[in-house]
Amino acid sequence: MNKNMIERNVSQGIISTYFSKLERNLDLDVAIVGGGPSGIVAAYYLAKAGLKVAQFDRKLSPGGGMWGGAMMFNQIVVQEEALHIIKEFDINYEKYSDNLYVMDSVESTSALLYKAVHAGATIFNCYSVEDVVFKNNVVSGVVVNWTPVLREGMHVDPLNIMAKCVIDGTGHDSEMCRTVARKNGIQLATDTGDVIGERSLDVVSGEEEVVNGTKEIYPGLYVCGMAASAVSGTPRMGPIFGGMLLSGKKVADLIIEKLK
């Protein structure tokens, strides 16, 4: 290696390979908006099934609210119904009581991300999805920009990424569902036709209903995780993550069935 060229090669290596990665992901099977645990699980199972999937998260560190456990006590709880997913991701766990298992939140989040990428998913951090591509009354892709551009209020146009299916995994805010309903005057598959808004905490009901609410909420647009709770008006559940994991797997299964 020419030592006088290493500085240039460092920059060129980053720029050229990143450009190639972005170009490869301009036309997707599935675009996942939001980098929380439900979306990451979906990315893993979709990629494992051979679908072309990319996940977009506005934060520098994807993982949603899983990193901090509860009130920065970095432990999380998962019920037995979701333990098979924990095992598939090779996460260490310990039985705490009947039906409940505890694990380290940092290990758990890291494992989800690692496994998703190694299954073939691409994760783009520092990306905000500000809109969707809406063609022939079908959600057909996402409109992306750098997070700092939006935070600074800079007038910079975004880029478009096409996708056969889009997953709203944006958590409590259910941003994609709100945007699609507000801007296009359409009816979502909810009791009101719009985002209902999540209810206050109830662990049992919240865990059941987040999975029940995971579905195609509008042609081309799917919803999972806390976004599913917010859209359908079901309770939040706090730092128990079985429902999040099961929701991610369910939305992946629905899309795999549709596209495969």
Q: What is the predicted role of each segment?
A:
Residues 85, 90-169:
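Feature captures the FAD/FMN-dependent oxidoreductase FAD-binding
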Residues 47-67:
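Glycine-rich FAD pyrophosphate-binding loop
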Residues 68-92:
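N-terminal glycine-rich dinucleotide-binding loop that anchors FAD/FMN and/or NAD(P) in oxidoreductases
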Residues 25-54, 244, 251-252, 256:
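N-terminal Rossmann-like FAD-binding beta1-loop-alpha1 element of flavoenzymes
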Residues 215-235:
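Short FAD-binding loop at a beta-strand-to-alpha-helix junction that anchors the flavin cofactor
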Residues 168-184:
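Flavin (primarily FAD) binding-site architecture
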Residues 1-29, 195, 199-203, 227-232:
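Extreme N-terminal leader/targeting segments of oxidoreductases
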Residues 231-259:
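A conserved FAD-binding loop/helix module that cradles the flavin
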